[in-house]
Amino acid sequence: MTNIRKTHPLMKILNDAFIDLPTPSNISSWWNFGSLLGLCLIMQILTGLFLAMHYTPDTSTAFSSVAHICRDVNYGWFIRYLHANGASMFFICLYAHIGRGLYYGSYMFQETWNIGVLLLLTVMATAFVGYVLPWGQMSFWGATVITNLLSAIPYIGTTLVEWIWGGFSVDKATLTRFFAFHFILPFIITALAAVHLLFLHETGSNNPTGIPSNMDMIPFHPYYTIKDILGALFLILTLLALTLFTPDLLGDPDNYTPANPLSTPAHIKPEWYFLFAYAILRSIPNKLGGVLALLLSILILIFIPMLQTSKQRSMMFRPFSQLLFWTLIADLLTLTWIGGQPVEHPYIIVGQLASILYFFLILVLMPTVSLIENKLLKW
């Protein structure tokens, strides 16, 4: 008799996705981050659900409701910090996952890649509206600064900003709708992740060599389930260490001051995972130009498959491209550092140079070096 997991309509879907899925035999730990992202998403939805049971999305009580969660709710402090630091772990996994895709040429699965870019944007939107909810100083001013960027859109900008605010400034209506967005978006992310997986399983996984591995596949379970569990243990260990030893390491002290529209913090900055984009935004002295650069810094990922000039898919055997890839990583780390610094000399010029290098690397240097490598292979 055939096993129920292969015949039952629901079990069959799970079986084909996680158990009998043919997987390349040589994929490395860099392929672990997809499942870790799934784990992060589940953790964020669960901790978020329990936080939502005690949180009140109202300007007069939001800040004190978060304090109440930390002080009075059983293990409320733990749930709150798991949720806050879980977001950081989510973005670490997300950036590693994208970096893997860039390095090994996974972007050649175009539908999977484009859904992935859409997922990135949705996760960023979720994290942004979530940061506003505690209604501290950085929540309020972060929301004010970032939503205000839309006013750079010609003709409809101001109307659009006031429509999003639900008034003439960030206030009660803004907080309520941001809470609604923050609640619904993770479920949209879950649906998109399912579509992402659907498209991936149409083609099968890529592997470090970038060479088709159809003749050398192994079942996902038990070989990769056990590897994924190891990765999950590392993730949980790191998250628990962060949450229990230094819960505020990645947060901003300003967010422990209740939101006050009459007092602007000295340095308005987003959470660490947005600093690279914030640095690119600030490096351009023109408002509209900055907004366009900010958008392009993320949306440039959509154009990566079109910029592929190499005859080889992966960078595994391309040392010059590898050098440029790691230069790009170093550049992004530099931008992240600059985004957290005040707007003064020498940070301004360093940020501008790093921003120029970011676009120059992706749009010009990498495609050119790939062409040179093609020529070298002919020798």
Curated annotation (Swiss-Prot):
Cofactor binding note from Swiss-Prot or TrEMBL: Binds 2 heme b groups non-covalently.
Cofactor(s) recorded in Swiss-Prot or TrEMBL: heme b
Keywords of the record: Electron transport, Heme, Iron, Membrane, Metal-binding, Mitochondrion, Mitochondrion inner membrane, Respiratory chain, Transmembrane, Transmembrane helix, Transport, Ubiquinone
Subcellular location, record wording: Mitochondrion inner membrane
Gene3D superfamilies with a match to the protein in the record: Cytochrome Bc1 Complex, Chain C (1.20.810.10)
UniProt topology in membrane: Multi-pass membrane protein
Molecular function GO labels: metal ion binding; ubiquinol-cytochrome-c reductase activity
InterPro entries linked to this entry: Cyt_b/b6_C, Cyt_b/b6_C_sf, Cyt_b/b6_N, Cytb/b6-like_sf, Cytochrome_b, Cytochrome_b_C_euk/bac, Cytochrome_b_N_euk/bac, Di-haem_cyt_TM
Binding site for heme b b566: H97, H196
A GO BP entry: mitochondrial electron transport, ubiquinol to cytochrome c
Pfam families the record matches: Cytochrom_B_C, Cytochrome_B
Spans through the membrane: 33-53, 77-98, 113-133, 178-198, 226-246, 288-308, 320-340, 347-367
Presence of the UniProt keyword Transmembrane in the record: yes
Keyword Transmembrane helix: yes
Residues holding heme b b562: H83, H182
Binding site for a ubiquinone: H201
One Gene Ontology cellular component annotation held by this UniProt entry: respiratory chain complex III
Function, as annotated: Component of the ubiquinol-cytochrome c reductase complex (complex III or cytochrome b-c1 complex) that is part of the mitochondrial respiratory chain. The b-c1 complex mediates electron transfer from ubiquinol to cytochrome c. Contributes to the generation of a proton gradient across the mitochondrial membrane that is then used for ATP synthesis.
Entry-linked PANTHER family: CYTOCHROME B (PTHR19271:SF16)
Quaternary structure annotation from Swiss-Prot or TrEMBL: The cytochrome bc1 complex contains 11 subunits: 3 respiratory subunits (MT-CYB, CYC1 and UQCRFS1), 2 core proteins (UQCRC1 and UQCRC2) and 6 low-molecular weight proteins (UQCRH/QCR6, UQCRB/QCR7, UQCRQ/QCR8, UQCR10/QCR9, UQCR11/QCR10 and a cleavage product of UQCRFS1). This cytochrome bc1 complex then forms a dimer.
Miscellaneous comment in the UniProt entry for this protein: Heme 1 (or BL or b562) is low-potential and absorbs at about 562 nm, and heme 2 (or BH or b566) is high-potential and absorbs at about 566 nm.
Homology family: Belongs to the cytochrome b family.
Protein name: Cytochrome b
Protein's organism: Lissodelphis peronii (Southern right whale dolphin)
Gene: MT-CYB
